[in-house]
Amino acid sequence: MALSFFFLAISLGSPTAIGDVSFDLSTATKKSYSSFITQLRDALPTQGTVCGIPLLPSTASGSQWFRFFNLTNYNDETVTVAVNVTNVYIVAYRADAVSYFFEDTPAEAFKLIFAGTKTVKLPYSGNYDKLQSVVGKQRDMIELGIPALSSAITNMVYYDYQSTAAALLVLIQCTAEAARYKYIEQQVSSHISSNFYPNQAVISLENKWGALSKQIQIANRTGHGQFENPVELYNPDGTRFSVTNTSAGVVKGNIKLLLYYKASVGSEYDIPTTILHPGAMGMLHNQNGNYVTM
């Protein structure tokens, strides 16, 4: 991908400048939100596809490390969010002249993102478990939807220890997780003017993105389409089911981005690693890619 950043103005329907993907919640429709998520996916670099699903790069560095998107809420408040291209992990955001970084953000990122702003290190990481402990609620008890995202932006602009942590839980799921999964995108796009509590299907997909990505790549490598280990997910009604092969619906029509998986040295499932700028500063190797420890 030749350009480091993209600006796709959803409200205008066409690119207006190099910089970011943008979405104005005040004019949101089901179609415009889905277009925003699609263009966010498209702005991420990939190293080919596996089973027809874009595979994210194994590593990235320098200006290639991040993509950015802007969100403007009902109150005309705007935040700019930085996303790690290797795992769609949100690492920082800017509100006016202040930028906020998760406490576990690599030091090199501070030199690359939001230059010229006042930098604040948040007193928590972007891990779901940590954010939920700060908020005092599990994700299934925190509302999602466009109205919830609008309120979240306000709570990101006006920092508060607990309220901002809750806001980040909403942000992550309504953007990064929606980019990873069509089902989560559809859940949010069905709630343009109302909120909803995420069901167990949403939560289990969020928790198992790394596991699904790994098993899809292993199954593709063997040529048989069978997972080495089944991945346990939940239906919306809370019943459990196992995904065991690449013919499953979650593989063929739901997961939209794959976290790169590199097998152990000497494994028959080993997949070659692509490094965008070897030896450059700011190199980051993704790990499990999930916002929650499983």
UniProtKB/Swiss-Prot annotation:
Keywords: Glycoprotein, Hydrolase, Plant defense, Protein synthesis inhibitor, Signal, Toxin. One of its GO terms (biological process) is defense response. The gene is TCA. Residues 1-19 form the signal peptide. GO terms for molecular function: rRNA N-glycosylase activity; toxin activity. This is Type I ribosome-inactivating protein trichoanguina. Inhibits protein synthesis by depurinating 28S rRNA in ribosomes. SUPFAM superfamilies: Ribosome inactivating proteins (RIP). It catalyses: Endohydrolysis of the N-glycosidic bond at one specific adenosine on the 28S rRNA.
